[in-house]
């Protein structure tokens, strides 16, 4: 006697399952996703194509394929998320590359440089293709630095991105060989410098920033120490501390201000720069130098101001000084600006903490 298995109870073969899946996928190709999901909760996963997991090393991109790639940043205004508002700065920060700088003594230095490039974005534009900023800068990176070279890079990415305003900032550590005070030794002092080219409303400004590290001896503490010695024969020492001034200057149009020129100005204003190579005679000289130039943070700001005012190549400027106190558990700070370029109602909450220079 033969026993027949009902068709409903028979398991489909693999071949039958593959045919059914192919039919389901063909149907899903021309069916709204909501209808596919309504068929069964697991249906969307079943109809998803089987993708290759191996990296296609031999695949090449032709013009037709490139043209088919989605470009969301250049999409219509309907894709904008949030308010349709103008963005003053959008771009990339801290891409690094070696840049060649010319020095005042007719030498060249190649220094690792951190570059930030931004443009303005109109309210009706979705976004920008940020890689264009990098490509524009790289096109000029082999040339020795000058503000004219930066201007050409800025012109390129303003044109490529169809933006009205743009900015390039370059940050690097600039080495200068400096002599000790008395021993005749020399050592390398490194200065944090940043250069900016700002194009806003068709007006361009060249800006240079310099961090200058110096020692500040408190004039009050110096007098109190001398009083103790004189009146009571009591040995006492005044307090002094490492201090930092961030000097920002606008270079007047058509003028050339070398990095070394700005260094000379700030050194003449406050001569107690921290030292590199120090023997005993240098340490004694530094103590004498500090005693001859005691300085409050207010004095420092005004001394830098006087030096900057004396140079006709410098327009607007700002001095931010921080005396990182050895007496107090807080710092003494000052900000002095001249001209509208650096004037601001608000200060960056982390402005003064950015002035700490650590090894």
From Swiss-Prot:
InterPro entries found in the cross-reference section: GTP_cyclohydrolase_FolE2, GTP_cyclohydrolase_FolE2/MptA
Keyword Iron tagged: no
Catalytic activity, EC: 3.5.4.16
Involved pathway(s): Cofactor biosynthesis; 7,8-dihydroneopterin triphosphate biosynthesis; 7,8-dihydroneopterin triphosphate from GTP: step 1/1
Catalytic activity reported: GTP + H2O = 7,8-dihydroneopterin 3'-triphosphate + formate + H(+)
Class of enzymatic activity (EC top level): hydrolase
Keywords of this entry: Hydrolase
GO biological process: tetrahydrofolate biosynthetic process
Site (May be catalytically important): 218
Cysteine disulfide links: none
Highest taxon of source: Bacteria
GO molecular function terms listed in the Swiss-Prot or TrEMBL record: GTP cyclohydrolase I activity
Recorded family membership: Belongs to the GTP cyclohydrolase IV family.
Function: Converts GTP to 7,8-dihydroneopterin triphosphate.
UniProt xrefs under PANTHER family: GTP CYCLOHYDROLASE MPTA
Name of the protein in question: GTP cyclohydrolase FolE2
Organism lineage string: Bacteria, Pseudomonadati, Pseudomonadota, Alphaproteobacteria, Rhodobacterales
